[in-house]
Design a protein with these regions (language model features):
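Structural signature of PLP-dependent enzymes
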Residues: 151-170, 176-205
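Helix C-cap/helix->beta junction micro-motif
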Residues: 19, 82-83, 113
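Conserved PLP-anchoring active-site segment centered on the Schiff-base-forming lysine
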Residues: 1-10
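Hydrophobic beta-strand scaffold residues
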Residues: 23, 87, 117, 247-248
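Active-site PLP attachment segment
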Residues: 106-149, 153
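PLP-dependent enzyme catalytic core of the Aspartate aminotransferase-like
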Residues: 3, 17, 42-48, 145, ...
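Active-site phosphate-binding strand-loop segment of PLP-dependent enzymes
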Residues: 10-11, 30-96
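Conserved PLP-binding catalytic core of the aspartate aminotransferase-like
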Residues: 186-243
Length: 276
């Protein structure tokens, strides 16, 4: 069985169910406090049967924007190891949280603990290759024999699924990462985007207050990554789309990265109207 956070990216459930797994959830987001139910999450993971698969967002949790702290990760790793669980780490937004190395540190912690893990990495956002869907699946095994068996099974799945992936996007990523000058430029631009997104979070909070929203929306600035869990209801999100042309999911998730100087005032005014 697979266990995913509540909530998680919708496609996580769809993909695992499509592969024949039973998908369950563990507590994560606390709608009352606007934070994490970490104690409940840890207790739930600690009660899982051995060899259960636990899907964890390595950084920039989608959709909530709330991440586990470094100290909390240590507790999660200890429980995963003690309970003999399999960690599946989804790394879709490396570099958008605190930095490339900082966001990737959790992977090294799992490996240092001697755990066998799966890591799915996406370059679609960090390289602006959204239409190319560039990524990788990395597997850490306990022996060469074990990893050989895993690789064999992966090849069978790939052969019956897509056979060969498109090479264009992967070639772009390889060219950038393999060239020191291009890599430095990419890291600089990614850092600029990270700073811009954080700045837009603050502008969103300030703009909502200026538009007459009396509710404290400062929690938006404590979230990280591309998305924000706004706390808006499904009815409010439907109104935003139908009446004001502002788009987000029915769960209240909004893409902060889509905000800019030209649309921020309209977005804030629209949200203020549906919150009245």
């Amino acid at each position: 069985q697979v266990w995913v956070s509540d909530p998680t990216w919708d496609n996580h459930r769809a993909m695992f169910e499509g592969a024949g797994f039973q998908v369950n959830t563990y507590p994560y987001y606390d709608a009352t406090t606007g934070g994490l139910k970490f104690d409940a999450m840890l207790s739930a993971i600690d009660a899982l049967p051995a060899q259960s698969i636990v899907l964890l967002h390595a950084c920039c949790h989608n959709p909530t924007g709330y991440d586990i702290t470094a100290a909390q990760w240590e507790q999660v790793i200890a429980v995963v190891k003690e309970r003999n669980l399999t960690a599946f780490l989804d790394m879709a937004y490396q570099g958008f949280g605190y930095g490339i190395a900082e966001d990737g540190a959790v992977i090294a912690k799992f490996v240092a603990a001697g755990l066998n893990i799966f890591v799915s990495t996406s370059f679609s956002k960090s390289f602006s290759l959204y239409g190319e869907r560039v990524g990788a699946l990395s597997v850490v095994g306990s022996s060469k024999e074990e990893t050989d068996r895993v690789l064999s099974q992966l090849k069978i799945a790939i052969r019956t699924n897509y056979s060969n992936p498109p090479t264009h996007g992967g070639a772009i990523v390889a060219a950038v990462l393999g060239n020191p000058e291009l890599r430095a430029l990419w890291e600089k631009e990614l850092g600029e985007m990270r700073v811009r997104i954080k700045a837009m979070r603050q502008k969103l909070v300030d703009g909502l207050k200026a538009a007459g929203v009396t509710k404290d929306m400062s929690f938006i600035t404590t979230q990280i990554g591309m998305f924000s869990y706004s706390g808006l209801s499904k009815d409010q999100m439907v109104r935003l789309r139908s009446e004001f042309g502002v788009y987000g999911t029915d769960t209240g998730r909004m893409c902060v990265a889509a905000l800019n100087g030209k649309n921020i005032d309209h977005v804030c005014a629209s949200i203020a109207k549906v919150m009245q």
